[in-house]
Amino acid sequence: MKLRISSLGPVALLASSMMLAFGAQAASADQGIVIYNAQHENLVKSWVDGFTKDTGIKVTLRNGGDSELGNQLVQEGSASPADVFLTENSPAMVLVDNAKLFAPLDAATLAQVEPQYRPSHGRWIGIAARSTVFVYNPAKLSDAQLPKSLLDLAKPEWKGRWAASPSGADFQAIVSALLELKGEKATLAWLKAMKTNFTAYKGNSTVMKAVNAGQVDSGVIYHYYPFVDGAKTGENSNNIKLYYFKHQDPGAFVSISGGGVLASSKHQQQAQAFIKWITGKQGQEILRTNNAFEYAVGVGAASNPKLVPLKDLDAPKVDAAQLNSKKVVELMTEAGLL
């Protein structure tokens, strides 16, 4: 008995293949998107819950640190299972973008965020922001003794009087801004003086706790740590004050948290929709009401009323697309900080 191979006509074969392709596409969409997330988990969970409720698109989060996930994406390349990358700071976004791993974002999405909070090339976008701040214990340091600039912390009189977390992505982002603003030579000199003057702690929250307990007079961290603690019990921040350098000082640097869609994503439409949602009115409104206490960056969006308004911080103009994490690590290593 012979097999009948041509029982389906050309039209039927075409229809069959189209149905199979559509089914595979639908199955792929049903799986939702995978986000490599280095942002605060509670904030991103609020975003994910709102997005899924509105769109029905499922989201799987893989949480980690800026540098950890950024380097992982570079290593995985086009084979990465990630559809979206979210960070706390810009340098990790620059790392991934330099590896040519991001897809261009939709024009409508880019238009939702103020131009100063997104790179002009349009391959990633600001999703939130945080300000550098000098925290101090008024029992140890009077207002008259406060430094005029972040650069003053390199002076001999600050030896043993301030703290930071040099191994963290947050502080390294601050150094990356210093590098862009002042250049390699000045940055290395400041880092070497820092090595002599400061006390190292692991994590910004640990720096805050140490200042609060009077173990060290002051520290350089991001603004939201005391606000987050104050919204809970305040036990780790009740004894500290916040000082904003302003005057476009390197210490007034505002770091942009970034979001981007991987070019290798098999769920481009859904991934683009997620970035559009979190930078839109609903996503940015969550920043106003959520206890993450980060700044909203959307056009016309309001931040938490407890925060000093972004426009009043007088931050330096820094091109987030130029922040160089690799060079920062090299310089900090040379200075003996890593």
UniProtKB/Swiss-Prot annotation:
One term of GO molecular function:
metal ion binding
Identify the domain of life: Bacteria
Its annotated compartments are: Periplasm
| This protein's record includes keyword Manganese | no
Query: Where does the signal sequence lie?
Result: 1-26
Which residue pairs form cystines in this protein?
none
Ligand binding (Fe cation): 40, 88, 224-225
Q: Cellular component per GO?
A: outer membrane-bounded periplasmic space
Q: Which Pfam families match?
A: SBP_bac_6
Q: Which UniProt keywords apply?
A: Ion transport, Iron, Iron transport, Metal-binding, Periplasm, Signal, Transport
One BP annotation, GO: iron ion transport
Q: Which family does it belong to?
A: Belongs to the bacterial solute-binding protein 1 family.
**Quaternary form?**
The complex is composed of two ATP-binding proteins (FbpC), two transmembrane proteins (FbpB) and a solute-binding protein (FbpA).
Summarizing the function annotation, the protein's role is:
Part of the ABC transporter complex FbpABC (TC 3.A.1.10.1) involved in Fe(3+) ions import. This protein specifically binds Fe(3+) and is involved in its transmembrane transport.
- According to UniProt, the name of this protein is Fe(3+)-binding periplasmic protein
Record the organism. Serratia marcescens
Q: What is the lineage of its organism?
A: Bacteria, Pseudomonadati, Pseudomonadota, Gammaproteobacteria, Enterobacterales
